[in-house]
């Protein structure tokens, strides 16, 4: 099993051809997915870590995050009743959104990886270093 399948992620670095301006959001987005797009795109553009090839992944993240919120809103409007089928859909959408967020640097651990230069940063105070 390769180390990349065990959850070890490569260092996030600036892209060679990063987007410098957020493209228009897809027309099929619902209001919650659109709100997520508007929230994350300035952050991702500012970090210079995404290119045009990443837009499909970002679209999927926004749709999944919007779906999680939409199902939660429906649950609250139904008086807090939990529909087992919708809970399963919400759970899978949340998992997908969380996984994509980690690859895009949108969670605390991946942001720390960006700030520190990755997991392979040398440790200057290693007592065993010669």
Question: Where do the language-model regions lie?
Answer:
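An amphipathic, hydrophobic-aromatic interaction surface with interspersed Lys/Arg
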Residues: 26-78
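Aromatic-residue detector
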Residues: 45-48, 90, 109, 127-129
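Preference for short coil/turn "hinge" residues that link or interrupt alpha-helices
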Residues: 22, 42-48, 99, 121
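Generic N-terminal initiation segments characterized by hydrophobic and/or small/turn-forming residues
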Residues: 2, 16, 52, 83, ...
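Arg/Lys-rich, low-complexity, intrinsically disordered N-terminal tails that contact nucleic acids
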Residues: 1-38, 110-130
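Amphipathic alpha-helical protein-protein interaction segments
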Residues: 59-64, 68, 75-120
């Amino acid at each position: 099993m390769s180390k990349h399948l065990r959850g070890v992620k490569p260092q996030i670095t600036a892209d060679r051809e990063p987007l410098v301006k957020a493209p228009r959001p897809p027309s099929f987005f619902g209001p919650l997915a659109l709100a997520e797009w508007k929230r994350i795109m300035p952050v991702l553009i500012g970090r210079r870590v995404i290119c045009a090839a990443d837009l499909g992944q970002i679209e999927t993240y926004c749709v999944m995050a919007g779906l999680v919120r939409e199902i939660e809103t429906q649950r609250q409007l139904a008086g807090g009743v939990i529909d087992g089928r919708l809970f399963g859909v919400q759970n899978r959408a949340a998992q997908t959104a969380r996984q994509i967020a980690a690859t895009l640097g949108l969670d605390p651990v991946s942001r720390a990886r960006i700030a520190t230069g990755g997991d392979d940063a040398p440790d200057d105070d290693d007592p065993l270093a010669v």
